[in-house]
């Protein structure tokens, strides 16, 4: 019986470790040719307590965010004035995390508007 309990405990510990690794691994920084590209008309832009800049696009269930965008020099009011109602292209890495199991929130690696790059953290 002790052997079974030990196996269960080791298995459970390993499972918890794997889940923790999946949750806490950083978002990968990819090159542009490996990024997924999506375009749409910006419906809403807002920020959260973590200083992320969040984009909501028309006819798209996903939200897109720039991690700590306000800390990296982006101005929320300027983005709203420039982008709401206009088409943008966002590029993001293909990754999965248990915290967002259905991929409803995507980390933006690049934002383009009218051939202007507003944000870019893709590998060169």
Give names to the regions the model predicted.
Residues 73-91:
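Short nucleic-acid-contacting surface segments enriched for D/E, G, S/T with interspersed K/R
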Residues 66-73, 123-124:
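A short, sequence-level motif marking secondary-structure junctions
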Residues 6-23:
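Hydrophobic membrane-insertion alpha-helices, especially the h-region
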């Amino acid at each position: 019986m002790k052997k079974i309990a030990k196996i269960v405990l080791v298995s459970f510990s390993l499972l918890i470790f794997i889940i923790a690794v999946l949750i806490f691994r950083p978002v990968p920084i990819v090159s542009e040719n490996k990024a997924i590209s999506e375009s749409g008309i910006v419906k809403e832009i807002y920020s959260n307590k973590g200083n992320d800049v969040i984009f909501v696009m028309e006819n798209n269930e996903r939200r897109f965010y720039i991690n700590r965008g306000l800390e990296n020099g982006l101005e929320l009011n300027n983005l709203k004035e420039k982008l709401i109602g206009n088409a943008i292209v966002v590029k993001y890495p293909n990754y999965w995390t248990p915290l967002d199991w259905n991929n409803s929130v995507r980390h933006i690696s690049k934002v383009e508007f009218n051939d202007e790059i507003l944000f870019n953290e893709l590998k060169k």
